[in-house]
Amino acid sequence: MRKILLLFFVSSLFANNFEISPKNISQCKNQICKNILNHYANFMKKIEHESFIRKLELINSYLNSLMPRYDDFYNTNVDVWSTRSEFLRRGGGDCEEYAISKRDSLKDLGVDNQKCLLVVQEKKTKKYHMVLAVWENLHKEPLILDNLSFRVLPLSKRYDLVPEYCLMDGKYFKIKKDGISLEPINIRMQTYENLIKKEKEEKFWKN
């Protein structure tokens, strides 16, 4: 009985009650912003026990419903990417901010699988774009969550995209020709490193 109680106590310490931090709420400038944050928190509570695939589908669809704002990813003079808090408070963002917010949402839902911010090139337009790549396991190709698509598909089924490089845990990789494994590459992106610094200083949830 003591072991059961101890396990329950320890698990409750690390449980996420999905309650927005007061500091996060205080940075809202209007009621719409507060409503977005609270609705997101309730959504996270609702889906926390869904399956791996279902979580990916639901998070992708939910965040894709927020308005895109094409304001900075293609502008080389802007070196700021928004955190999940900033993205939600603003009620939308650019492609990289959808990918960042999906990554953080899945992590908070207990999806600890390997995931990276994947920079791709669109074959048709030749423009660069960012999506979230998530590996169900390291022997399978990643699944792609894209703000331009409500479907979660394996990378090989995204015929319209060419993977360029992958940002994960402060490091840089490229996806090998097998479409599954990663290889370190020697590049640096100041925008990504600035994002990491901001995220370390930010407290999204109350607990």
State where each predicted segment sits.
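Structural motif marking the loop-to-transmembrane transition
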Residues: M1-R2, F52
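A structural boundary/capping signal
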Residues: A15-N207
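Sec-dependent N-terminal signal peptides
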Residues: K3-L13
